[in-house]
């Protein structure tokens, strides 16, 4: 089979609906942050972890960590994100933080994973990744 035909078959198999199903099965949320514009998009699972909904404007955790990230984790989080974006790494970013649900006093442990897309000058222009709720694991560890 020609390579182009295989590629088109894979594109039909891996539809956005199926990818969303896989993320739901893994209990993971997906985000896309356009670093140039500052605009961030979250899947419903990310919004649920944050205690937000589609009806309200959810904060960008990368530019406004003080709104959702535990105060003891904010500096660490911002530092690790900056280090990753400045480092030109091909290794995915992985940061474990405590995230507060908006309008609530409840906290969850979340692992924020991401990969940067870079321009021709190797500057980060986009960060794409998933959030994983790791509260059960962290509770067992503590």
Where are these regions (language model features)?
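Hydrophobic "anchor" residues
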Residues: 39-40, 107, 124, 131
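PAS/PAC or PAS-like capping segment
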Residues: 72, 134-135
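PAS-family sensory domain signal
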Residues: 14-66, 109-111
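Generic recognition of well-ordered alpha-helical segments
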Residues: 17, 79-80
